[in-house]
Amino acid sequence: MSIATGDFRSKVTSSTLLDKKSKHDPITCLTAYDYSTARLVDEAGIDMILVGDSLAQTMLGYENTLPVTMDEMLHHTRAVRRAVRHAFLIADMPYASYHVGGRESVRNAARFIKEGGAEAVKIEGGENRAALIDRLLDAEVPVVGHIGLTPQSVHRMGGYKVQGKTIRDIEQLMRDATALDRAGVVALVLEGIPREVAAMITAEVETPTIGIGAGPDCDGQVLVFHDILNLTFAPPAKFVRRYADAAELITGAVKAFRDDVKTGSYPSDDESYHLPKEAQATLEMVQNRKHAMRK
């Protein structure tokens, strides 16, 4: 039996994603890192929720995604799982959790399914990950691939740079996409690559492609929740579209609370609890006793 939210939407599964690709029905994906955010995103009708290792920056204040740990990722994945009823839930495997040999990599991935409640894990890399993906699928761990600009490779790439600009790089991206598609990934994230290259990959592979900075021709799009609400403290990437200024709204609300406390207008009498009238006499008796004891 499928789980449905109040509006009776059916649960999104890996089969749903394939069906959407075949019908040219765009797939939506956002990140979420906590219960409240995940509940809002899920109830808004987003198809996929990614507990991204970007939480290293958005939630924990790190400079990049590399420092976040397995325990931190599992902690946030469990919180999101408790909120999600509709979306397909994916957890990012953090840096050095799947670069450590096949057996330990499988064990780490399985923890996201068993302990975190994720329905798939996302790993970065191309054809060099095909063998690992085979092992993960053998262990009943669905995998989402991620090629192009892979943030965990920031030092090797020399920064966050658009990938796939040369013939050689385009050919490598095609080999990566084909290898992951054949390996059986349930979706493939294409990040930071030219629109034309993303369109070519999308037409070539059977798995749904999810773009982030890869143009409009992918099967779906993903953005970071904090980016679309202006809750980050750095200039946005070119591909980010901001849909609200939550930073301004939140700052305004916090300042208003501060001012109300300072001026004494919060809390008001209506926002305070009161003794019932019959108990007020008892309070007066207690106060009178205290006064008598002081004399």
Swiss-Prot record:
Q: Where in the cell is it found?
A: Cytoplasm
What exactly does this protein do?
Catalyzes the reversible reaction in which hydroxymethyl group from 5,10-methylenetetrahydrofolate is transferred onto alpha-ketoisovalerate to form ketopantoate.
DNA-binding in keyword set: no
Which InterPro entries does the entry mention?
Pantoate_hydroxy_MeTrfase (IPR003700), Pyrv/PenolPyrv_kinase-like_dom (IPR015813), Pyrv_kinase-like_dom_sf (IPR040442)
- Residues the record lists as binding Mg(2+): D53, D92, E124
Name-wise, this protein is 3-methyl-2-oxobutanoate hydroxymethyltransferase
Top enzyme class: transferase
Q: Which cofactor does it need?
A: Mg(2+)
